[in-house]
Amino acid sequence: MDSTVPSALELPQRLALNPRESPRSPEEEEPHLLSSLAAVQTLASVIRPCYGPHGRQKFLVTMKGETVCTGCATAILRALELEHPAAWLLREAGQTQAENSGDGTAFVVLLTEALLEQAEQLLKAGLPRPQLREAYATATAEVLATLPSLAIQSLGPLEDPSWALHSVMNTHTLSPMDHLTKLVAHACWAIKELDGSFKPERVGVCALPGGTLEDSCLLPGLAISGKLCGQMATVLSGARVALFACPFGPAHPNAPATARLSSPADLAQFSKGSDQLLEKQVGQLAAAGINVAVVLGEVDEETLTLADKYGIVVIQARSWMEIIYLSEVLDTPLLPRLLPPQRPGKCQRVYRQELGDGLAVVFEWECTGTPALTVVLRGATTQGLRSAEQAVYHGIDAYFQLCQDPRLIPGAGATEMALAKMLSDKGSRLEGPSGPAFLAFAWALKYLPKTLAENAGLAVSDVMAEMSGVHQGGNLLMGVGTEGIINVAQEGVWDTLIVKAQGFRAVAEVVLQLVTVDEIVVAKKSPTHQEIWNPDSKKTKKHPPPVETKKILGLNN
């Protein structure tokens, strides 16, 4: 080994102080060796208070000016305006984790931050970047190899999945989820295929304002919170559906146009031509066998009268999400004009279902391969409905993961503490750079249950000391609860193995990439010929650079 590289015995001594336990004053603060660390720390500081079942909510103001109260890390990451490339990379990893596994976004962000902080200390201790990267990769492989041995529970093929979904759904809402968990478990169980496969798209979710969460129920088919327009409200058999992303009425072209009318006769002719065009369009829909039209736009009264004349049920969708989901389920395109689709959607019947003071429109099938059940959510506030809807989707995703791999591991930070103990034991015996890297990885893993305890309002040092002692004694089922440490088996707090493993892979990919980055170089465009020679331009430069320059990006707080 090179003489400039500290020995394996020197590194642990130089890493004795955890960076979180040795605060510095601003004057004493050293520059980061990892250029991406500050950006990752800032991003994690936004997500950290939302981690776990006791995480706090945030008022999120979107680009459209809409205010949303949420504790969902995925929604927060999606709404943030980021400039730093490392923050972009971490957000992409978190969103990929959510899309592929349905959960674990905050886990990815926080563990990445903790590992990079430990990597910074290893670099300051003199460990070269290539050896650090190799040691971290070895530790990740050790974690992934050990993880299946912690799976002490498994969902049976004929078992009610409520107990397995309970902790997943309760993590993402402030309301009690017992009733909703049973509904989701029933829906998932009912549409599970005989071969054990499960299609998440066969479970619909419909949110109706009004009532309470206990009023939520299951409806057969696919239900949406659309508005029925006109006199036609039901198709009892042979429904053929067309979807339109436009007003149900006269077209409104984007380009402005002015009709030049010189006499009352011209005005009458213009109005007559418009009416004839609308009647022709509605007649074409009826001739193609369309008896249900779902529109995302305004509904014209005269056009609605024509639809009643031809026996067409007109439904006004309330959101893009509903009509896009209908397009996917019915396998019919979303049309920009009132034209018959080449492939209309088909279902057995369409009818309205009254639920207290709410109204749902139900599309029902009798054949296989289509949505069988819809979870209809009730709630007094929009924010409460959004939170419940998010919890339902997490439950559906969790059941989908369990159908692929039914194994479950302890939750509430118990798995992270067990893995940290394993890495600490091995790291203390290993020689070379792998030993300190294993110890650093163990420190990073302990950061997750520490965050759970902090968000629960507990005495963090006492909880972590008690958990460490219990895990050292061999009890790997102890995690962080509301009032202290809990036995996760008795409390029923479980995580799916496949989601946790995917989360570790995502974290490893980001960390192994960022530890090799020393600086961020941004190409700067050279000024154009007009900008150079325009004397009135404020950006005029007498001597423009002949080549592109580079700019080192910092973090925009």
Swiss-Prot record:
Pfam families: Cpn60_TCP1
Name by which UniProt lists this protein: T-complex protein 1 subunit theta-like 2
Top-level taxon in the UniProt lineage: Eukaryota
Miscellaneous comment text of the record: Presence of two highly similar CCT8L genes (CCT8L1P and CCT8L2) in the genomes of human and chimp and of a single copy in other mammal genomes, including rhesus monkey, suggests that the duplication of this gene occurred in the ape lineage (Hominoidea) after its divergence from the old-world monkeys (Cercopithecidae). Expression of CCT8L2 is confirmed by many ESTs mostly identified from the testis.
GO MF annotation: an example: ATP binding
Keyword Chaperone tagged: yes
Compartments, record wording: Cytoplasm
SUPFAM superfamilies on file: GroEL apical domain-like, GroEL equatorial domain-like, GroEL-intermediate domain like
Keywords: ATP-binding, Chaperone, Cytoplasm, Nucleotide-binding
Coiled coil (residue ranges): none
Function: Possible molecular chaperone; assists the folding of proteins upon ATP hydrolysis.
Cross-referenced Gene3D superfamilies: GroEL, GroEL-like equatorial domain, TCP-1-like chaperonin intermediate domain
GO process terms (BP): protein folding
Organism, as annotated: Homo sapiens (Human)
UniProt entry tagged with the keyword Cytoplasm: yes
Gene Ontology cellular component terms for the protein in this record: chaperonin-containing T-complex
Chain segments carrying region Disordered: 1-33, 531-557
Family indicated by similarity: Belongs to the TCP-1 chaperonin family.
